[in-house]
Each structure stands twice: as C-alpha cells, then as structure tokens.
C-alpha cells in the first residue's frame, strides 16, 4: 500500500492524459486570459469531455462519480496552469452541483444535474442580496 499522497493506478490513468491536455491546451493562453479577463468557453467545453463538471455527481445523474481525492487532484492540475479556470471547475462542483446533491429535491436533481454534469450548463452560486449582507455562515 502506498502513502496517502501517492497517486494510485486509477488516478494515474485519468490524470496522465488530463495533464497532457492541460499542458497543450490550457497553459498556452493562461497568461493572456489572466491579463484580459477573457472567459475560456472553448476550454470549458473541452474540459467537459474529461468529466470534470460532473466529477462528484453520481453516475445515476450523468456524472462521473469520481472520488473527492481524484477530483481534488484534477483541480490541482488545472490550477497549475490556470487558477481562474480551476476555480470555475471547483465552484461549479462544490457550490452548484454540491448543493443540489445535498439539499435538492429528487425533481431538482433530475432536472439540473445531468446538464451540469455534462458541462452543457455551468453552475453558479449567488451569495449577496441587496440589503442583506454576505455572511455565508
């Protein structure tokens, strides 16, 4: 048994091609996107093919059903090249799909999770309302 921080066989199988994609597709324009604030919709569509937008969504709802550990490694790999894109993926999974999985009705899960998991829809989360503040706790 390996150490907790070593990549297992499944992780290497997923992360190897994923890292190659990131190096070839995400890295080249990262500095320019950061400078201009351009949102990389083309990369979002390509990342969707790797299942990152449904990484933590169960397969029953169209997701990849990956482990939290593998998902964290995927976000880490994206962040190595593009922090903003990594945050997009992380917030989509934790704040959007995560909250639907946690507190959504079955009807809401069936309506929203397949589109979110496939990358057809990009999740968002609103915190501040006029006149009420921003305390997420």
Give, region by region, the residue ranges found by the protein language model.
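Short non-domain terminal segments
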Residues: 3, 16-19, 37
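A non-catalytic, amphipathic alpha-helix used as a structural packing/dimerization or gating element
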Residues: 10-24
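Intrinsic disorder at enzyme termini
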Residues: 1-13
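Glycine-rich flavin
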Residues: 27-137
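General helical secondary-structure elements
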Residues: 8, 15, 29-31
